């Protein structure tokens, strides 16, 4: 799904909510991320979203959108995105928007606290540390939070 189609879907999904979206000039992206409760991190030219790591490092709640397969770091571990953000397949954005719109203040604060814990894993040094642990003990308890999975067949 193209980003322009995704924006149309976002606009339609927000109709019945108190949520709003803003597309800011690229020079002001950091300012807008800091002001936003939730930040969209659509997959990029590759399978994942570089913006996801940027949003986590800044300490805001990411909303990762994918088109065919969720390609997320640390999936299935205690530092999985589900503990501090949202994800959904493009085309089903309304479900994600409903989750965001109905989040309790307590759940939101818990997600922010989880972000503070996982932030280091989304920095360059944190990723290098995870790779080193995985190489030293790929199947053991000290192997870090990286997981291997088969690359999906769809080419991107």
For the regions a language model picked out, list residue spans one by one.
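Catalytic binding pocket for nucleotide-activated donors in carbohydrate/polymer assembly enzymes
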Residues: 28-122, 136-138
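Conserved catalytic-core segment of nucleotide-activated headgroup transferases in glycan assembly
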Residues: 1-25
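C-terminal alpha-helical cap of glycosyltransferases
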Residues: 124-156
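Low-complexity, compositionally biased segments
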Residues: 18-19, 70-71, 83-86, 140, ...
